[in-house]
């Protein structure tokens, strides 16, 4: 054990170690106990060595950090004071755990001797996150080697880590000159263990860390931090069984590579990173409600699919051969516990019979055309698309948003209906054109989406533009994310908020059965009547109410400065009928495709 450091000395050493491990963005929620860390970070930011983001709400701060690490692919730290401040980080820590994001929580704490004494703002916060984050409880006596190793492990771990820092004594540095609060470490060649050295090499070789380098994800269309393991030693799958590839959230290019090599249909969710090329189906989850579902013999699951019950039913079917590949968090998606789990993506040595893919592709093309034609007709005559009202359809809005996502665009998608509408209306994008489409799908919650989107936009400054597409409840749940203080980094970001005054997704579930209508509005739909324009004005955020699809398309083609909100009012009255309409179109599409095949 080393001699005890002052609080300022311990804070300096921690920030230096974070910097050595490639951390360049740090989010701070202010407080008294964390003062030594705050002053060190302010000085490091002024020196240009880190970019500091200050937020008054710890919950928002944590999701901002989550967005920053998702967008930049670097570890990001979030710093808080003691007490309930730490507890407010839990939702983002849970999401980071389930998505394998490198989120480093630096929680300031009282010294150990005050725990259990009733001292102000003192609780058992070391290990507060339980199974969701490993914890190192750092004392003023921690040795340089131990501290550096702890920080290096935190920055390299695929998932969140808590560094709980016991700060004792005087919380302010003796020298009031900010120049004395921060300096880069002097012994760069010898600090930190091998994990830290690897991270430093990674950061130094990353073209994004230079002013002239291009984002490798944008340049190649390949995720520089693969979510699943790709290896030439992957298991070789025999051809013959009628196979589909299910690409869930964060599947990455591996799913597309397998589907293309084998010639199999691929059901790729919008946030999969694999919804590219001919093998990807736009309406795959709808086609699972048709007879095509019964012809499937084998399923390969890559990533974390969460969007539909037909897909969950498919990958849980014990009568099928189901193969599930572990994700970056080490977990394979196998809700039915029927899959054979693989550590790496399997491979094939030849392409399969094309007639299997053709049957899916033909039905997908026909169903897509039927949906588009029905929506177009409903804009002028609702009788031509039964169940759909006149006015803006949420599906039509999703189509406009999808069309606005050009090459090198970042799109952040909220949970609930927004991502599901995009799943139906977003056609697969052409190969060799990268779109960065992400959402908080680890636990699929609506919380923190505004802050996450701001973090992603800040983490990907070279993106052509960043759009966030979300519902009104998702927006309101994290409206504190718009509270960006004066002088703080502020991205160019457009929010498209689909405002149907409540929770429309419940109308498509069991709760939406008309037999339960007496309680539905109050306990599920939860209409709020909030004036989003006034809310945005209070946060000095640009706002526009858009009631026309053409205007929405034009607005999304603009290049705004700063954050703006495009509010699109829609009705949720037809959501249940809309779901039934889509299922009926799927049956029509398969019947027509089958009839054409028989005639040919």
Where are these regions (language model features)?
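Conformationally flexible catalytic loops at phosphate/diphosphate-handling active centers
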Residues: 5, 132, 153-238
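Structural signature of the thiamine diphosphate
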Residues: 14, 21-25, 70-80, 86, ...
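Glycine-rich, acidic loop regions that bind phosphate or pyrophosphate groups
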Residues: 96, 107-150, 268-377, 485
